[in-house]
A protein has these predicted regions:
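Surface-exposed, glycine-biased beta-strand/turn segments
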Residues: 328-384
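Loop-to-transmembrane alpha-helix initiation sites
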Residues: 110, 134-143, 243-248, 269, ...
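Long hydrophobic alpha-helical segments that form multi-pass transmembrane helix bundles
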Residues: 142-195, 326-336
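Short, non-helical or kinked segments that cap or interrupt transmembrane helices
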Residues: 75-90, 136-138, 217-218, 222, ...
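N-terminal signal-anchor module of multipass membrane proteins
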Residues: 1-74, 148-151, 188-196, 200-212, ...
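Structural signature of hydrophobic alpha-helical transmembrane segments
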Residues: 48-61, 103-116, 186-198, 238-249
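Membrane-helix interface "capping/anchor" motifs
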Residues: 51-55, 71-83, 101-107, 125-137, ...
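Transmembrane alpha-helical segments of multi-pass membrane transport proteins and ion-pumping complexes
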Residues: 54, 58-74, 88, 92-93, ...
Length: 384
């Protein structure tokens, strides 16, 4: 069953911009965790607003991108689903955060915020058309990563500095300093999903995810643990000091590979673990390369791993144990439940079925490997 009701869709709503925006808001925030739960989306929106300027910048970016997409006549269903708007949300929030931490001039921050909203929307539309048509995959948050990296240089070139301070958060007052360092790193990875750095915010995000999708929370946990363990084997600290800069990539890879694109099962659980470890390796490599340009890795490691792994799996006829999810509007629990029901109703679904074209006695007039026809792909055909 779906944990929470997803709401009904009315065709008349597609003609109303305000109604479409209201429908898109919770989906835009929930889709970051590959969730379709509306209550979880509203919770993520509220947690984003715990850092008012960052949260409002992201919300305003979503509204601006929705209006622009409406004017450009982007598919209304794509707007309402949040797929067209979550990259502007991420890009606008990240640009304002970078501007506040770097001490950029207010006018520069506003200009780059507007550029992030427009560029990320257009890049999402363009890249989704290309990636979707060739690999059948979502563009992920790759447009936001590209836009933020490029506009970051604009801000620095205007006289701004690199990250020099921390932004105050309403949840920083509930940070638990006595918490073990490993747990600090774990919850701070979840806090980074709402552009915060306190373990208290991470606890709230994690609790919301557990209530929304227990399977999604399991996959995120496994992805993070695998990534943090990989960093530890590379000689880096496993706690907050060693994972805060990239830990959210691990949990996103776990959710995407374990419960986003695949129906949750034992094989997808293993894929989530492998994906988390691969993301850690890619993150370390990218940190060296991007450090030359004064950039952090952002969400690039997770994007590269998820797109690379899923593109490879798309080329396989049927990966052992993995079942590609045929539904994009269900929670992981709903997908798993429907697959169990389908397996009981159609136990031989994946076995080929051969039926004769008629009943009774028939005469075969031409058999296998005919001299003139029935060659190549058709060599096993029979004429009756």
């Amino acid at each position: 069953m779906i944990p929470f009701p997803q709401g009904t869709h009315r065709a008349a709503d597609e003609k109303s911009l305000p109604r479409s925006i209201i429908a898109a808001l919770p989906r835009t925030y929930a889709i970051i965790f590959y969730s379709t739960d509306l209550r979880f989306g509203w919770a993520m929106l509220a947690l984003n607003l715990c850092v008012p300027w960052i949260g409002l910048a992201g919300l305003a970016g979503v509204l601006a991108a929705a209006c622009l997409a409406w004017v450009l006549q982007v598919d209304r269903g794509w707007i309402r689903s949040g797929f067209a708007l979550f990259n502007p949300l991420l890009a606008c929030s990240a640009m304002v955060l970078a501007g506040m931490l770097g001490g950029w001039a207010p006018g520069v921050i506003v200009m780059l915020w507007a550029a992030a909203a427009v560029f990320s929307l257009l890049l999402t539309i363009g890249m989704q058309g290309w990636i979707g048509s060739r690999m059948g995959l979502s563009v992920q948050s790759l447009p936001a990563v590209i836009v933020v990296c490029l506009l970051h240089f604009t801000g620095v070139g205007s006289g701004g500095q690199q990250v020099v301070a921390q932004v105050a958060s309403a949840t920083s007052q509930i940070d638990l300093l006595a918490m073990p360092d490993v747990l600090q790193g774990f919850f701070r990875a979840f806090a980074a999903m709402v552009f915060q750095s306190s373990a208290g915010a991470g606890i709230l995000v994690y609790v919301a995810l557990v209530f929304s999708s227990p399977l999604g929370a399991v996959m995120a946990t496994l992805g993070y643990v695998a990534g943090a363990a990989t960093l530890w084997m590379l000689g880096l600290p496993m706690g907050a000091t060693g994972t805060t800069w990239c830990g959210f990539n691990f949990l996103l890879a776990g959710v995407a590979l374990g419960a986003g694109y695949q129906v949750p099962n034992r094989a997808s659980l293993l894929l989530a673990v492998v994906g988390g470890g691969m993301t850690a390796l890619v993150a370390v490599a990218l940190s060296v390369w991007m450090g030359w340009f004064g950039l952090g890795v952002g969400a690039l490691p997770y994007n590269l791993v998820v797109l690379g792994v899923m593109a490879a799996l798309r080329l396989l006829p049927r990966p052992i144990g993995l079942i590609v999810s045929p539904w994009t509007t269900l929670q992981p629990e709903g997908m798993a439940r429907l697959m169990q029901i389908s397996a009981l109703r159609f136990p031989h679904y994946y076995q080929p079925a051969v039926f004769l074209p008629g009943a009774g006695e028939r005469v075969v007039t031409q058999g296998f490997d005919g001299a003139l026809t029935h060659r190549g792909w058709w060599r096993h055909a029979l004429d009756f």
